[in-house]
């Protein structure tokens, strides 16, 4: 059933978890390779490194005991942002490129499900982003040490949370790129990202006693809708709390991870549903 | 006119591997979502070991229906069975090798890497992949370029890598979209020979072509499309033999208008005879068995027979006739 033996005795494993995994792995491999060739990727990586170098210069202006602190907060803010940029741009372009260059037409007719293809793209991009985040974190660590600071366990956990956010943004990007053309899907993803980053602010405003969100009913409804349909990305940005000495306990990390992965799954499933209905003419 | 698929079932044939049931596809284009009917109610069936030519001019709907067979496109209505399954089932597609129309692959990969990748998608193990890659790149004559990135490959070379990857998993059915187009004469000859060899090995071949010449030797059966409609299908021998039973004659009619009218009236009584004015004279196309009646009518009516020959239809004649019938026959 799950295996097919060809006319000349070749064994094809088609069904079953191992076969599915092998196919997804093949897509992941090719995606990493393709995305890893993109000039865009190296541009963003180079930009992030430049910004880190800039933070060193900037920290010269700071008070002696504030130097490491500045590098620390700068890194925690800038590194994830640069990776999010990569996720949004590559996520918007990757699927479209396969359609545009017609490479998809040779791949989808193979015994592979469209869901496996999307999963492969998602995991491939995630792998690349993990590499980017790791490289940048290493450089950041070097700069921190240079400025008399250190990379603490809470800071590492904080970066881990940022990676969960990256996974989520990647699946949002794939969702929109299964839906529309690259520019629009990039814009939409950016929109959701920004909205997600500020939902906690809106939440605060909603529960305040004064202000437009508290007092104007239409704004209140809009705010509530936004809070309901957009994942709260503030969950994954804890650098301020870390600076104030918060330990980022594992209970928080696991709850936030579960939250992020659930949302990522929602968007990934949405991407698959959209992608499965598409005609590739 | 169009034979219903059910009528050509023949128990001596192998198992059914592909069936189209009233396949239709309508695209909506532009701001007003104008309907373009690319494929209309095409029914066909194919058996193991057969080689079927899917023929028709550009834009007749070949690629669209082929993409439906591979689940790249969802039919608007109708159904496709591939090895008794839906084309969306990977197990059905596992037995198919598809060559896209003007194939494209990742241009940063080498032929070896393309084959490896495709082999993985078919669930072949590493050793088999390596062995098949080597065999197939040799078969299509790409062993010299095996480790060069596809960027910079000519169209003919891309077609070769397309063919190699379609054969990777030793599929039972090859679905090739325009395998002969875009090749130079030598390349065409090589691909034709490969197709004949694959057929000899017992592979089933479904291929499309917009060029009707020089493919007669490649197919047992044809399905001819015209503007999305299957206008003729069946075994090539049957389709063309029927036309070998026709004759064509070149006539001289009497110069006297009254005699001419009389003779024309006599000729019109011969069943199945059609007259056509050619620059060289009047041509009559008629069933071969009616030739004696024609000669008799000519002798009595003062006409002359200048030429008489059996009508050997080519695929092109067949297509032209069917397409004309359709335009005249009041079908939209
Ligand atoms: N994506 C599409 N949108 C609109 N019309 C299309 C699309 N793809 C094909 N068509 C139309 O469908 C018809 C059949 O095209 P196609 O299947 O490519 O023909 P063939 O392969 O026989 O040359 C053509 O009229 C073509 O313009
Ligand atoms: Mg075509």
Kindly give the residue locations of the regions a language model identified.
Chain B
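ABC transporter nucleotide-binding domains
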Residues: 15-18, 22-226, 231-232
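Short loop/turn segments at beta->alpha junctions
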Residues: 110, 125, 235, 287-290, ...
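C-terminal coupling/interaction segments
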Residues: 2-10, 15, 288-332
